[in-house]
Amino acid sequence: MNELPRLPFDNPAILGIAPQMRALQKEGPIVRVRTAGEDAWLITRYDEVKALLSDRRLGLSDPKPERAAKSTARITMMALMAGDDYDREATEHPQMRELLVPRFSTRRMRVMKARIEQHVDELLDQLAASVAPVDLHRALSFPLPTMVVCDLLGVPLADRERIGQWARGTFDQSDSLHSVNTFQQVVDYMMELVQRKRTEPGDDILSELIAEKDGTLSDEYIAHLGCAVLLFGYETTIVRIDMGVLLMLRNPAQRALLAENPALAPAAVEEILRLAVGGKGSNALIPRYAHSDITVGETVIRTGDAVMLAIGAANIDGHAFPHADLFDLSREKPKAHMAFGHGTRHCIGRVLARIELTAVFERLFRRLPNLQLAVPEESLRWQEHRITGGFDEIPVTF
């Protein structure tokens, strides 16, 4: 009997999906694979991934959680998404979305856009005044999303650096004790902030949640929602800024187009979101569990089966995107990528993330037209120990 392909697949590249993932995608949309905890179905093609993302028969929670091997960081992530309990997921996750979706209103996003653009201008001013080489990650990619999510939550300026460091530590899979301790620091801080805002409300998400449901939401529950916004509201944007810069530097013709015409920034952002997935040690997978039988092609996924949705592979599926590997700002009416998911679990903060990325890429190469890596790309270190991956350093000259 042939041995099943084993996840995670080896991926020597900083950008892009694993070669084995590409090979499996060519063979068909669904294949049985082995993971650390259990066997699973791997879905690699665009149409099937999109359909399953919106299929209510798939859920976050495992009906037999004791069999699945999960890091402490992943357990924390599942709990924040109300996906750690099979019996409660169907009610708790929709309730979370019902409370949080209005917090990302058009009015608030309009206000946030002006503030984000100001943050980007200030960070680029500081970067341009520095002596090269400069760490772009520390100067721009990390502080911007941290500022933005702290603006949303009403976190005081003095607390933002430590909040960002705690949040990063929470998703560290290499040290369970550190992950637990930093997450507890985030929870404790959020509880204190909620209690402070009960007497000193502001124009922020926590203050609005305190007033929601006639003030009946508990401090603990509001703090839980605040932790979810914080932890999911900035880490992936940090990674995408870094990877977007690398994509631009790899594609000088597209970079020149953007520098000449900043109106192409939204198109650049969509290509970054589509292609800046994967990376060394990452397969860009969304784990789900079948809550009832599902048929994909001629294969039946049985109730309780684990399913891995390969977002990175779906986003470079040649059936959906002509010349899918090309970074191309001139794509005409491209299909929607799935960097933010799809369907009932579509990322709540996707509009905000797009605003942040657009503000960065409208400005970065106009302000720093000679921006280049200060080290060979292959020397950049992908953080395999972090759930979201990414880099801790991007040295550049300008």
Swiss-Prot record:
Catalytic activity: pentalenolactone F + 2 reduced [2Fe-2S]-[ferredoxin] + O2 + 2 H(+) = pentalenolactone + 2 oxidized [2Fe-2S]-[ferredoxin] + 2 H2O
Cofactor(s) required for function per UniProt: heme
One BP annotation, GO: pentalenolactone biosynthetic process
InterPro entries reported in the protein's UniProt record: Cyt_P450, Cyt_P450_B, Cyt_P450_CS, Cyt_P450_sf, PentlenlactSyn
SUPFAM superfamilies in alphabetical order: Cytochrome P450
Keyword DNA-binding found: no
Phenotype seen when the gene is deleted: Accumulation of the precursor pentalenolactone F and lack of production of pentalenolactone.
Enzyme class: oxidoreductase
Keywords: Heme, Iron, Metal-binding, Monooxygenase, Oxidoreductase
General function of this protein: Catalyzes the final step in the biosynthesis of the sesquiterpenoid antibiotic pentalenolactone by mediating the oxidative rearrangement of pentalenolactone F to pentalenolactone.
Protein name per its UniProtKB record: Pentalenolactone synthase
Organism: Streptomyces exfoliatus
